[in-house]
Amino acid sequence: MIRLILLSDFTESFSYNLLKGVLMYANSHEPWVVCRMPLSYKQTYGIKGVLKWAKTWHADAIIGRFDNDDNVEIFRENGIIAIAQDYKARFSNIPNITGDYYKTGRMAAEFFLRKGYQNFAFYGYRDTVWSQERCEGFYKCIAEHGFGNCFQSYQEQSLDDLWFYEAPPLLKWLQSLPLPTALFACDDNQGNRITELCKVNNIRVPDKIAILGVDNDEIICNLSDPPLSSISHNIVRGGFEAAELIVRLLNEEKVNYQDVVLQPINIINRLSTDFYSTTDTHIQTILKYINKHRSEEHTSELQSLRHLVCRLLLEK
């Protein structure tokens, strides 16, 4: 029986989806026991306190959202496998559960380009690898299509201030954007923040600013008004692969490990991006009809009209 500590933020769906993957592996192989350790435990007792608990509990492995100044080597020194869940930067001395963030950024850019947008924006953190690489992938893709000079970004906030932000400068930036703008947020939390600011300041979403997040956290996406579109990742698969890696590391002393890399799967299109940017009066007429009948959006007529709009935009 393998004993795993999952040190993570259980207020978000990412951790539960990761755990689902671990349990899928366990159900098809051997029993696992999982301790769900909240981040507050490490904040209170430090990394040595986490190790002390792990030793008392006889843990075999820990998947943790570690800070980069944490001495994660102490787990290996005590015979415990440690895997880092991406937080600010990747670790070089232990495996990471990370992602193809450039690819995610490109997927967001291609999505907006297909909708005909010519103005683009990114909202994210200044000090996290996953935010920075998503921004780079997004920008490089729109630059390749000739819109490199039509891009603005706001990356003033630290991840340490997750739940605190200064609204006035962010609002000033939003109000300065050319309209309509396609805005890619580094994750769903930040996307939700933008929809909230737009709502209370009468900036119409998606007509003026279309907003796309990442992670497809359904609670957060549906807290947004309008509901937030988001890029979905294979997080459950990542949990399964992390469990496989733990077993290999436990059974083979000198196994060469690779990071577990989550891949973007698709875009869950909700109302925050339900808009096409065009000056063509015929396409605008079709779009107005579609928006008027949103409650019937699953009818074959509206689906056919959506496909027609996509084809007409691609032909331009």
Regions found by a protein language model. Give the residues of each.
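Bacterial carbohydrate/catabolite-sensing allosteric modules
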Residues: M1-A61, D70-E296
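Single conserved hydrophobic/aromatic residue that forms the stacking wall/gate
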Residues: E297-K316
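Short, well-ordered coil/turn residues at beta-beta hairpins
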Residues: R65, A185-C186, E301-L302
